[in-house]
């Protein structure tokens, strides 16, 4: 049996995002609307927080979460192009992060886990 949305993605979330989402829901926010709004802004962490707290189909949650990563990738690509033009040089790390976001979106749509690479702290 395949893993649920929560089993696949809950471990990616920091408590601060869940706390924010919970507060918004307690104030009467519509969780699905909030998740979609954050997804459109390219903020997958916020979208995920709402998606984990609301009822909805696995497919619907995957779609919104994947869209958040795709939107963030698009915004990153636009920012990289803007910086390329402004500073007359490329910004490959921004483009690399956009590629990772697109791969994450694809994995989410397929119901697979995603890998989040974390930069170790500088000592």
Give the location of each predicted region.
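Generic helix N-cap/helix-start motif at coil->alpha-helix transitions
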Residues: 12-17, 25-31, 41-45, 58-65
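Alpha-helical solenoid repeat scaffolds, predominantly canonical TPR units
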Residues: 37-38, 50, 83, 101, ...
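Alpha-helical solenoid scaffolds that mediate protein-protein interactions
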Residues: 28, 41-42, 54, 87, ...
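Alpha-helical junction/boundary sensor with strong preference for TPR arrays
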Residues: 58-59, 72, 76, 83-84, ...
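Structural register within alpha-helical repeat arrays
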Residues: 20, 34, 47, 65-68, ...
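Terminal, low-structured helical/coil segments at or just beyond the last alpha-helical repeat
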Residues: 95-99, 103-104, 110-123
